[in-house]
Amino acid sequence: MIKHFFAAITGNLISLLGTLMMVLSLLFIAALLVMQAMGFEGGAYIGIITFVVLPVIFLAGVAVVPLGIWLHKRRDAKAAAEGRPVGHLPVIDLNQESTRGVLLGFVALAVPIIAIAAGLTYKAVHYMDSTEFCGTACHNVMQPEYTAFQRSPHASVGCAGCHIGPGAQWFVKAKISGSWQLIAVALDLYPRPIPTPVHALRPANGTCEQCHWPTKFIGERLKVRTHYADDEANTELKTALMVRVGGKQAGQSQGIHWHVDPNHTVRYLADPSREKMYEIELTDQLEGSKKVFKLDGETAPQGAEWRTMDCVDCHNRASHIYRSPQFEVDLALAEGRIDRSLPYIKREGVRILTEKEYPSHEEARTGIAAAVKAFYSGNYPDLADSPAVEQAGKALGDAYCWNNFPHMKVTWNLYPDHIGHQDSPGCFRCHDNKHKTETGEKISKKCSTCHNLVAEEESDSKLLQELGVQEPPPAPPATAEEAPAEVATGT
């Protein structure tokens, strides 16, 4: 029986090819598994080859073998009916010089072609994981995200590091999802703007926590933010927070990173935007207890979904940060891209950025520059043609174009950042005193749970000056009465 089985699967060219596909793929899978067991690290691509490519080749071989047997029997039956001899395999006579030449020529061409094809395939897959491909191949669609990414703290991290991460499973999911996205771009089927959050995003423990380990980000950190007042002098103001990053200290979880401690599991039921929480479930793994906090007076609608909380529920714009007009003007002033000596430039900059929407970046830059010049022409004509006014117009134009993309319908504050609660509900999605258990226990809204306010919009804080994060204001010029005698009298 075994003899007949082997004769069947090797008795014709098609079945023989299928058998070779099965045998060789199994041998390669076994070899790669042994290499991995011995500690060989080949990255995601070895996993793809081992668990995706080679199994597909094996299954293809399984399908080819019976197809060959069926075609072979059909051919033999037809040959017998016509009285022709039945041949199983073609005869290759290597004693003939011409046959040897053809065979050697075929092998000589096939080997380099296969090697080149394999190398090109690998490079193609590798290139499709690159930041350049993700950001520029679908330029119109990805321009907003790519622009924001280039200004983010993660600008040196490749897209695949966060959107795919290590391992074969999520690589395959990403490529399947990406195939549909390519079709959507080609047929102009993609939404404008791109909806967020991304519901198919890999959990953060497989991406963020490859670099950021919450249990090691512990203690308190001083966070100082620089603002500028709307007055004529654009007075510099400092706000300082002692942020309770938290983490695990002395066996106890505390602070902000308490939310992702492995001893606690936080789940929530929210609307698709994840901006309105209807139920929040807290499970203490050590005690085995569970609490459910429900939004008072409301029930979840159709489409609400349960989700286990992780990093991106707060750090939702870690790499694609769209900033507010106020933040952009403050940043430009702090970096010196806008001259702080220009009267009322903070107030006017925010006004000019928000008073009008432009149909294109070119019109935005032209219109914003003209609006800046018009203000100073009407109020400070001596400054209207100064380089500082021209530079301010350019900086404000940049700020607008970095955050607004008319062709994708992206405008100011479209994508909220849930870190904090200044420009979006952020923390207050849960910490609002409106979610409570059946016994009446509420989620605290106490500010000191996450931070302590050290200074708030202060221009002359002795404490911040001692910490070295604020310069003392310049001393007023000495009067004649206060000046030394030789200066006052000119002697």
Give each language-model segment a name.
Residues 2-11, 88-96:
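Cytosolic juxtamembrane amphipathic/interface segments immediately preceding
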Residues 5-22, 52, 103-107:
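Alpha-helical transmembrane segments and their helix-start/interface "positive-inside/aromatic belt" motifs
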Residues 23-36:
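Alpha-helical transmembrane segments of multi-pass membrane proteins
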Residues 37-59, 65-203, 221-305, 329-337, ...:
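Sequence context of c-type cytochrome heme-c attachment sites
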Residues 134, 159, 208-211, 311, ...:
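Short cysteine-rich clusters marking metal-coordination/redox-active sites
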Residues 163, 212-215, 315, 431:
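Helix-to-catalytic-loop junction in kinase catalytic cores
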Residues 188-209, 349-364, 368, 477-481:
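Electron-transfer interface patches adjacent to heme c in soluble/periplasmic c-type cytochromes
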Residues 305-380:
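Mixed-charge (acidic/basic) macromolecular-recognition segments
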